[in-house]
Amino acid sequence: MIELTDDQKKAVAAAQASFINLKDNADILNKDQIDLLFGEARSMNGWKDKDVSNDAIKSIYELTKMGPTSTNCCPARFKFIKSDEQKQLLKEALLPNNIDKVMSAPVVAVIGYDLDFSDNMGKLFPHMDIAPMYKGNSEMNQSTAFRNSS
C-alpha cells in the first residue's frame, strides 16, 4: 500500500468535502431535463450546418474523462475529428447506413482504449499499488479496458 503525503491527504479530503457539499446542495433534475438526457434521447441523424468550437470539444472531453471507471483506470482515449480528410480515413470502417451521417457531422469522436492504462495507476489510484495486478495479465487488461472505455 502506498502511503499518501500530507498534501495528497489534504487533496483527498478537499475532494471528498467538495463532493459531499455538491451532493447536499445540488438541485434535483426536473422531468424535462431527465427526459432530455435519458427518456427521449436518441441517436442523431442530422446536424446543423454549424462549427463545433475547439473550446466546446475540450469542455465535452473534460466532462467525459471524469466518468467512473474501476480503480480509476481511465483506459479510454479520445480522438476528435473535424477535417474531411480525416473523416475519409474512417469511411471504410463505417456501416453503410452511417457513412453520410459521419461524413456530414461537424465533429466525430472516436473512442478507443489503451491496453497499457496500468502505467498511469500510480497517479490515478495513488493510495494503493494495483499496477502489478494488471502487469502481464493481457486478458484482464483487455476486459478492463473494454468495459471501462465503452
Residue ranges and their predicted role:
Residues 1-150:
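Acidic, surface-exposed loops and disordered segments
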